[in-house]
Amino acid sequence: MIRFRSDRLAAALLAACLAVPAFASAAEPAAPVVVVRDQWAQAAYVTPKAQREAALATLASQSEALIAARPRDPDALIWDGIVRSSLAGERGGLGALSLVKQARRDFEAAIALDDAALGGAAHTSLGALYYQVPGWPVGFGDDAKAREHLQRALAIDAGDIDANYFYGDFLRDQGDWAGAAAAFEKAIAAPARPGRDVADRGRRAEATRKLAEVRQHLASR
């Protein structure tokens, strides 16, 4: 059975984004997008694990309706992708593949409309998918594309908490322990985002935990 790594797919992301990555932008997203964004943070970081899949499945119905109403809104597309990625992480197995494929389509559509939307969140989330989803012939995983999208996200916003977190996680997977440590440190030091306390606290805790693991590995060499 294929098992998606739920701690990583839960934001994309991987973020997200996904994100799953949890993103902010200079211009506040439309109110319906903010509702999905904030409910995602609650589902990802507050809802108990046993109830998380059901909460995300309900939210996926809302985000699907959101993009039906706002098909050319990159922010809405990004958040639908993040919700689907997070749900895939909780669900796991072959059943998650259809969710991450739809998430990829969402992120690609958002990039085509505005690749800098939500501070490059579509690149962060798409990059996170590329290094966590299995490769061919099962899935579309591709480490080269993961690096490309994560670096593009950092070029758009070098201080973004999610872009740095997922880049650090990617580098850790690649065996670049020093690079991973530097990226996690940047994620932890990222400035707080207005109205994003829950997401910031959760992502910072994840980065702190991963940084401790990386430092332990570096110290043991």
What are these regions (language model features)?
Residues 24-62:
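N-terminal leader/linker segments that initiate helical-solenoid repeat arrays
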Residues 71, 115-117, 158:
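Short coil turns that delineate tetratricopeptide repeat
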Residues 76, 120-122, 163, 197:
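TPR alpha-solenoid repeat register
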Residues 183, 190-221:
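Terminal, low-structured helical/coil segments at or just beyond the last alpha-helical repeat
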